[in-house]
C-alpha cells in the first residue's frame, strides 16, 4: 500500500473560493440548446419550452454562472436575430459548426432559463465578424434602464427590467485560425481594449474577460497573452484559458497526469500576467477565467461523419467513463489550488455537448463526471488552505513526473467545516494517507464519500444511469483520533472527506 501525507495549517491560506469557479457553459452547438435545455412541445418541458428534468439536474450542480452563447458560435452571432417575436427570427447557416441556427431560443430565453436554473449569465460578444459598436448595442439592450433605442426595444420584447449582466467575454479563441474573424494578438488586443472601454463607459460595473490562448499547445502561447495584455491591461479584468484532455492512446496513467499539465498552464499564464503588470508598473491584478475545461475526445471520430447544414445534430456527445470522472475530479482540485488567481471557471459544456448531463426525448441522466463536479461545487466553498501533499510520484509520458495523489483542503470558517478532496491515481494500489488536524479542535468526520469502480471504462447511460455513482465509504476508511486523520483511499478513486465541529 502506498503512503502519503497531506499537510495544512489554518494560517497558511491560498485564498477564498469565488463561487464562479464552478461555472459552466451553454453554446449553440449540437443538442446543447435544442433538445438539451429547450424542447418546445415536449411533455418534459414547461410553458416556455425549458426541459424541467434538465433544470433539476443543473440545480443539483449548483452552477453559479453560465457562459453563453459561445464558443466558436459567438464569432458569427448576430444577437438581434435572437430576440423579438419568434416568427420574425431568421434561420441562418452557422459557420462555426456547419449547421442551421433557427434562433428560436435566444438571448432573452437564456436569461429566463438562467434565472430558473439559479445561475447568473456570463455573456460573450462577437469580436470575430463584428466589433465594439455591436457589443455596445448589446450591452445597451441588456443593461440600460430605458429611454434609448435598444433598451426600449428590450421593453417592446416584453422585458421591462434590465437583465443587468455584469460579466462579459470579449470574443472567443481569437488566436485560433478556425475562428471566424481570427486575429493576430496585436489586432485582437486593440479591439478588446476598445470594446471594454466602450462597455465600461456605458456600465462601469461590468467586468470583462479577454481571450487568452485556446490551449497550451497553441504555437503562439505566451506571446499571445503578453501582447494582448500589453494592449488591453488597463481595460480588462480577466484573461481566459481553455484546455481539454483526452485518452485516445488508452494510456490511463498518462491521461490522469493531465491535471499536472493544467497546473503548469495556470502557473505559466499567471507569470505572464504579472510580467505585464511589472512592465506597466500596474497596480491592479489580472486574474484568470478558465472558461473552457473538460475531457473531450470520445466523439471525435463520430463527428467526422456528420451531415452538414442540419439542425441540432448529435454533435460532440462524449459518453464519459469512470476514468474521465477521476480526471475531472483532479482538474477541479487543480482549479481550487489556484483559487488566489482563478476566479472564474466553466466546465464545457453543461448539457449533451461534452457535458455532465445527457438527454433524450424520454429523460435526462447524470454522466460519470457529474458527481465530482456536483460534490465539489456543493462543498468546495470557503477558503482554500495552502495544501502540501507529500506523495509518491510516477513518470508520465507527456507531463514528466506526476503525483499519485492530488488533494486540496477547503475550510469554511463561518460554518466550521473542513473538506478534503483527493484523487488516488494509482491503478493498482490503495493509499494510506495521514493529515495532522490538531489545529481544528473539536472537528469530527461527517462523511467520507468515494467514487470508484473496478472498470475504468464503466459509463452511465439512460438504460443504466447508476453504473458509476458515489457511495459512503466504510467507517474503517477514515478515522480521526487525537486530531490526526488517517484515511485509506482506494486505488483509482475520487474521495471527499467532510469534517465539521
What are these regions (language model features)?
Residues 242-257:
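Active-site His/acidic residue clusters
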Residues 1-224, 229-238, 262-263, 267-304, ...:
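Non-catalytic accessory regions flanking glycosidase/transglycosidase catalytic cores in CAZymes
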Amino acid at each position: 500500500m502506498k503512503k502519503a501525507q497531506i499537510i495544512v495549517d489554518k494560517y497558511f491560506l491560498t485564498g477564498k473560493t469565488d463561487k464562479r469557479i464552478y461555472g459552466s457553459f451553454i453554446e449553440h452547438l449540437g443538442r446543447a440548446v435544442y433538445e438539451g435545455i429547450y424542447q418546445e412541445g415536449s411533455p418534459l418541458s414547461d410553458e416556455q419550452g425549458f426541459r424541467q428534468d434538465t433544470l433539476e439536474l443543473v440545480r443539483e450542480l449548483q452552477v453559479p454562472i453560465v457562459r453563453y452563447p459561445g464558443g466558436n458560435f459567438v464569432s458569427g452571432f448576430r444577437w438581434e436575430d435572437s430576440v423579438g417575436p419568434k416568427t420574425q427570427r431568421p434561420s441562418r447557416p452557422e459557420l462555426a459548426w456547419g449547421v442551421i441556427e433557427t434562433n428560436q431560443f435566444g438571448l432573452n430565453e437564456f436569461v429566463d432559463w438562467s434565472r430558473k436554473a439559479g445561475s447568473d449569465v456570463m455573456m460573450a460578444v462577437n469580436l470575430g465578424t463584428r466589433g465594439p459598436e455591436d457589443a455596445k448595442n448589446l450591452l445597451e439592450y441588456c443593461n440600460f434602464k430605458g429611454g434609448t433605442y435598444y433598451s426600449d426595444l428590450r421593453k417592446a420584447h416584453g422585458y421591462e427590467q434590465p437583465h443587468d449582466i455584469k460579466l462579459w467575454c470579449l470574443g472567443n479563441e481569437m488566436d485560433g485560425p478556425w475562428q471566424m474573424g481570427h486575429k493576430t494578438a496585436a489586432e485582437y488586443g486593440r479591439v478588446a481594449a476598445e470594446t471594454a472601454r466602450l462597455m465600461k463607459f456605458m456600465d462601469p460595473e461590468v467586468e470583462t474577460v479577454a481571450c487568452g490562448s485556446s490551449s497550451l499547445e497553441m504555437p503562439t502561447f505566451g506571446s499571445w497573452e503578453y501582447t494582448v495584455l500589453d494592449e488591453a491591461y488597463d481595460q480588462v479584468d480577466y484573461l481566459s484559458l481553455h484546455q481539454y484532455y483526452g485518452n485516445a492512446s488508452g494510456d490511463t496513467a498518462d491521461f490522469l497526469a493531465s491535471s499536472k499539465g493544467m497546473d503548469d498552464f495556470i502557473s505559466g499564464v499567471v507569470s505572464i500576467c504579472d510580467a505585464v503588470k511589472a512592465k506597466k508598473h500596474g497596480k491592479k491584478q489580472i486574474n484568470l477565467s478558465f472558461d473552457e475545461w473538460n475531457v473531450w475526445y470520445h466523439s471525435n471520430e463520430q463527428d467526422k461523419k456528420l451531415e452538414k447544414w442540419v439542425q441540432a445534430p448529435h454533435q460532440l456527445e462524449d459518453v464519459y467513463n469512470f476514468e474521465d470522472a477521476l480526471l475531472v475530479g483532479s482538474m477541479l482540485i487543480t482549479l481550487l489550488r489556484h483559487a488566489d488567481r482563478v476566479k472564474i471557471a466553466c466546465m464545457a459544456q453543461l448539457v449533451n455537448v461534452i457535458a455532465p448531463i445527457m438527454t433524450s426525448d424520454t429523460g435526462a441522466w447524470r454522466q460519470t463526471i457529474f458527481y465530482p463536479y456536483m460534490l465539489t461545487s456543493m462543498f468546495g466553498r470557503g477558503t482554500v488552505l495552502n495544501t502540501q501533499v507529500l506523495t509518491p510520484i510516477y513518470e508520465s509520458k507527456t507531463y514528466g513526473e506526476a503525483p499519485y495523489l492530488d488533494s486540496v483542503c477547503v475550510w469554511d470558517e463561518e460554518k466550521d467545516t473542513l473538506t478534503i478532496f483527493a484523487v488516488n491515481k494509482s491503478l493498482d494500489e490503495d493509499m494510506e494517507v495521514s493529515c495532522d488536524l490538531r489545529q481544528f479542535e473539536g472537528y469530527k468526520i461527517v462523511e467520507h464519500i468515494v467514487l470508484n469502480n473496478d472498470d475504468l471504462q464503466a459509463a452511465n447511460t439512460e438504460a443504466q444511469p447508476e453504473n458509476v455513482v458515489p457511495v459512503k465509504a466504510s467507517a474503517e476508511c477514515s478515522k480521526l483520533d487525537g486530531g490526526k486523520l488517517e484515511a485509506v483511499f482506494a486505488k483509482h478513486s475520487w474521495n471527499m472527506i467532510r469534517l465539521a465541529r
